[in-house]
């Protein structure tokens, strides 16, 4: 059974609090767009597809409740203005992830078109927004399943020495059910390999400084009983150099893919791509079309979010009381007091280092001149 990180039914939204994982599996209710903004900003939910879905559904939940309590504005124009303002606020929570702004833009278009229809009421606007937001949830799961299947097929055909070999795959950060509406992107590829009986072993990086790999990806791999090993980020080069390990592919997710294929993803991705090229390992990006931003021409145009220094200088873990056996979460300092910290959340991997971009439409590869033509995916 695949982990369910987002629960939504009849206007009620709850998410698993990822800050508590892997020690406590606790769901929190999200009732308003402001609570959605806080959950995204505080990284209680993270992963580009997931934050877009949670943002949309948080506003859908708020509108659903306002509608039940008869507190919706009386005119279609007022409701439309309210939705636009709330969507703009939600986008500000994580600016690097294009899925969030893309979802907001699509929802705004749907609402604007309905508001311009003669005779549209305020409730009509609410209904069309809720329907569209709920549709995004279902579509993301469907798209992720296709991404997983496409990636598994590509690896089997292009990264394995023979048809009889099984894949050894390294992944970074968390790109599974916890980062999406379900199944996952890069981790979905690993799940599909496992389902096809073509996975030998998966490796996941710790993913400092927020430890999404050790806290979240490892949690999902254990949950799904996938054969896997956790390594620290600094062990990747040693892992790739071991003949007995024989890593066939590195598969990562993406927060934004520029028109030329440059990819912004969790900090450390660029370094893995460099290592992959040196060691002759296939390097793949797995992302839905909503992550591809054709308006951004190259990685140099991508805004990179910087996170608080405390995420580097402190770490959270569980402590068991020797007397009672009770487990509680504690945050401790691990760095010298007063040291300066640089903490970019993402880096940009040049398209030259990427062998393929896995989408729900298929796997985009470069032409003979070494260029991606991602616009063709939208034809």
UniProtKB/Swiss-Prot annotation:
**Pathway annotation:** Amino-acid biosynthesis; L-methionine biosynthesis via salvage pathway; L-methionine from S-methyl-5-thio-alpha-D-ribose 1-phosphate: step 1/6
Q: Which InterPro entries match?
A: IF-2B-related, IF-M1Pi, IF_2B-like_C, Initiation_fac_2B_a/b/d, M1Pi_N, NagB/RpiA_transferase-like
Q: Which Gene3D superfamilies match?
A: translation initiation factor eif-2b, domain 1 (1.20.120.420), Translation initiation factor eif-2b, domain 2 (3.40.50.10470)
Q: Where is the active site?
A: 255 (proton donor)
Q: Where are the transmembrane segments?
A: none
Q: Does the keyword Kinase apply?
A: no
Provide a GO biological process annotation: L-methionine salvage from methylthioadenosine
Q: Which residues does this entry assign to the site Transition state stabilizer?
A: 173
**Which GO terms fall under molecular function for this chain's record?**
S-methyl-5-thioribose-1-phosphate isomerase activity
* This protein's UniProt keywords: Amino-acid biosynthesis, Cytoplasm, Isomerase, Methionine biosynthesis, Nucleus
What's in the GO CC field?
A: cytoplasm; nucleus
**What EC number(s) does the entry state?**
5.3.1.23
Q: Which reaction does it catalyse?
A: 5-(methylsulfanyl)-alpha-D-ribose 1-phosphate = 5-(methylsulfanyl)-D-ribulose 1-phosphate
Q: Describe the function of this protein.
A: Catalyzes the interconversion of methylthioribose-1-phosphate (MTR-1-P) into methylthioribulose-1-phosphate (MTRu-1-P).
The UniProt entry's sequence similarity note says:
Belongs to the eIF-2B alpha/beta/delta subunits family. MtnA subfamily.
Protein name from the UniProt record:
Methylthioribose-1-phosphate isomerase
Instruction: Give the organism's phylogenetic lineage.
Output: Eukaryota, Fungi, Dikarya, Ascomycota, Pezizomycotina
Quote the gene name from the UniProt entry.
mri1
């Amino acid at each position: 059974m695949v982990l369910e990180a987002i629960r939504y039914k009849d206007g009620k939204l709850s998410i698993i609090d990822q800050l508590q994982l892997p020690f406590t599996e606790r769901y929190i209710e999200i009732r308003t767009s402001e609570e959605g903004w806080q959950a995204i900003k505080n990284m209680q939910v993270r992963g580009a597809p997931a934050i877009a879905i949670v943002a949309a559904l948080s506003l859908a939940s708020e509108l659903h409740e306002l509608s039940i309590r008869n507190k919706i504005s009386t005119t279609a124009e007022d409701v439309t203005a309210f939705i636009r303002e709330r969507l703009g606020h939600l986008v500000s929570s994580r600016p690097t992830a294009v899925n969030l702004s893309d979802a907001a833009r699509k929802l705004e278009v749907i609402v604007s078109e309905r508001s311009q229809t003669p005779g549209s009421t305020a409730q009509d606007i609410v209904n069309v927004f809720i329907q569209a937001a709920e549709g995004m949830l279902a579509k993301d799961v469907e798209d992720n399943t296709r991404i997983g299947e496409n990636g598994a097929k590509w690896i089997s055909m292009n990264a394995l020495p023979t048809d009889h070999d099984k894949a050894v795959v390294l992944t970074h950060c968390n790109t599974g059910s916890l980062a999406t509406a379900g199944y996952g992107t890069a981790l979905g590829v690993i799940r599909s390999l496992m389902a096809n009986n073509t996975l030998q072993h998966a490796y996941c990086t710790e993913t400092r400084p927020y430890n999404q790999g050790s806290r979240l990806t490892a949690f999902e791999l254990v949950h799904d009983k996938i054969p896997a090993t956790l390594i620290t980020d600094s062990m990747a080069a040693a892992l790739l150099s071991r003949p007995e390990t024989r890593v066939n592919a590195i598969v990562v997710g993406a927060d934004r893919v520029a028109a030329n294929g440059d990819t912004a993803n969790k900090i450390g991705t660029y370094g893995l791509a460099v290592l992959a090229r040196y060691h002759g390992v296939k390097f793949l990006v797995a992302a839905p079309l909503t992550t591809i931003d054709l308006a951004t021409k190259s990685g140099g145009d991508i805004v990179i979010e910087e996170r608080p220094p405390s995420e580097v200088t402190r770490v959270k873990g569980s402590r068991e009381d020797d007397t009672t056996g009770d487990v509680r979460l504690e945050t401790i300092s691990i760095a010298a007091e007063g040291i300066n910290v640089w903490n970019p959340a993402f880096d940009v991997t040049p398209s030259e280092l990427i062998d393929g971009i896995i989408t729900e439409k298929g796997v985009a590869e470069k032409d003979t001149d070494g260029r991606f033509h991602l616009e063709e995916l939208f034809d």
